[in-house]
Design a protein with these regions (language model features):
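Acidic/His- and Gly-rich active-site-bordering loop/insert found
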Residues: 2-113
Length: 114
């Protein structure tokens, strides 16, 4: 990756910072612990977000609550890019052991040691 491409990517991220923070916060608020593995609520949110941004989504639910989302953008010609991720998180466990509630987003500024 050239320095120019890196700079353009970082500039794009900087220009979208508020939306990225809102998206991450919205995702954190949706419990998606596995087990039990019910992804219905978070999948509905993800599909809604992606469709708002022009993607066409298909939902596959091989088991109740176990959801896969396949989306496409634009015409199906030329090069393709596949992104693979997951929507579930490990169980939060004992909430008393958390510094902050696990499903309430907190933004902290952490300074590097001097």
């Amino acid at each position: 990756m050239t320095a120019d491409v890196k700079e353009r990517v970082w500039n794009k991220i900087d220009s979208q910072k508020a939306e990225i923070i809102k998206l991450a916060s919205d995702l954190i608020r949706i419990p998606s612990e596995n087990p039990p593995g019910n992804m219905s609520e978070i999948a509905a949110f993800v599909v809604g977000y992606l469709e708002q941004h022009g993607l066409v989504c298909e939902i596959y639910e091989p088991e109740n609550g176990r959801i896969n989302i396949i989306c496409s953008l634009g015409e199906k010609t030329g090069k393709e890019l596949v992104l693979n991720g997951h929507m579930d998180v490990v169980p939060a466990g004992d909430s008393e052991r958390w510094d902050f509630p696990p499903f309430i987003p907190v933004i902290m500024l952490i300074a590097a040691p001097v």
